[in-house]
């Protein structure tokens, strides 16, 4: 890879001069051609005849063509050199800006790229006393390091492409000038990348490393990615990746396996760029249609006769789709087509299963996260989980029937047979949450225990896709700034709450005899946390509470039941509690500090603000006790240690209030309250559930109730300090908030407990 000193100190002037010199040649060749034609050819015409003249004029005609070709070739080389200079100059400028930024932030960048934090504050007591300082410095260092690496990768790819273009013998053995020369670095890199991909599993480790460097450097470049995939074609794309993953899986600790792991990510991100219709150029609808057709075809992945597995194209593609954010125009039809195929034949992905005949796994997902890739639905749903626009369109749109070849069947219906006769698929949410649907173990391992574990990957990916569909961001987005909810998203949340909070919904996620969708409980909790305003409206019936965009119009009974089921998951419990406390704190601040014309006393407004959140907290307390003592799906320590993402959910809960209310508030609520609320949430979840006897007696919420009272009083204290209230008034309002929290928490817990009869 190009080094930092080399790029930083490189004198690019001679390259610019060379480009200018080559750029001047076409005009000179044109002048020579005109002079040759005038002084030689035209001079001889009409004065020389016979066989020798005929042969001479033919030779001179070829010479004239050579002048033309020489001019064309010189112009193209000039453009290539100019492009190289432009790119190198841009990378050099970016590198120098990063080095200046590093110095300004007290980082030292060594010549080998190693970065050392030399901030003098590390030697002061402030550093050790402030954990936030260490986090801030690490984030800056990581960002700087990744950006430096990116610039060097881009410069290296451009350097190698320029070298390959200039070393190419464009004239061939004839030594004649011609026009077969590269005109851009993208064209060179496309040829290099497709040539390696065409070798499939015959490519060397070094060649795969080069392919990865080219793809990674150009993954955001639509001209390169479109050219690469267009030249490779859908069939070869899937064929070469299928054979590479099958080969690499035989040696999971080898360099080759690591190269294929990296290739999976680079192919995914590059495909997302190439299929984005908002970018120019992009792959055509015909290319996309052919990819869908290939998805329903089987691929031979090994010449070994003892290797019987022939995956469908979608089983191969599923591994690539796990990486990248895809446009709905590309990804939604793939998801719809795959459902049509699976509904027509629920055993399609396992009808040629090698399980029971092979000792090793087979994978299209060498990254190893979320299964082996044997079930293509897992990969497709993961792709939707990173593509919120496509996920929303898929889950909120109509069910569309497709022919096997990937084209739409205008008059067709999607009907599925689970052994009790065919029935219509009501919606894609209905399809994936049907209790009779069998989730394919996302592994080819013949070990039955491993296969059983692998059935969790599909439902987990379904949860990820629903998170993206309802939130407008990828499921693994770590920020707090959230887009407002659309009407379609809010409607989908209503359907989800009705589904899992309605009859039979609890059995899907917490059933004692097996819960097929238990792995998606954390995602359902995240959805509730993202819709905390709607949730608090649902449990309280107060439609005046602020929501973030369109309202989900949640039913009270369904909302309570939904929270009770989902809250039994430690991760969901944390997200809901964190968002609830932040949202409630925002409501308390609004009640105490917001401008209002109402004559309702502030104490009553505070009680009203505390009530919905305390009700949610009560349901959560009882749900936690149920998980520990009833369904026995978790231990107290599972809830107590689950605090990594508290800050994210506190920030989102705060934003749901501050970003949605129209009544002015004093200052920036989200800014001043997040740190205090985060501390309060951590204290709230670090508790013990009731004893089993207390749980059986219906008193499993006492510890949680104390925490709800404390957090309500904390909210008043923060809002009071923020609004400049005197100590006595704050104390009185804290008492009011505490009483309301105690009563509402008890009501919420008892309502949840009553569901058990």
Tell me the role of every PLM-derived stretch:
Residues 1-172, 749, 753-757:
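N-terminal secretion-targeting helices of virulence/extracellular proteins
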Residues 176-667, 671-751:
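Non-catalytic all-alpha helical scaffold/repeat segments
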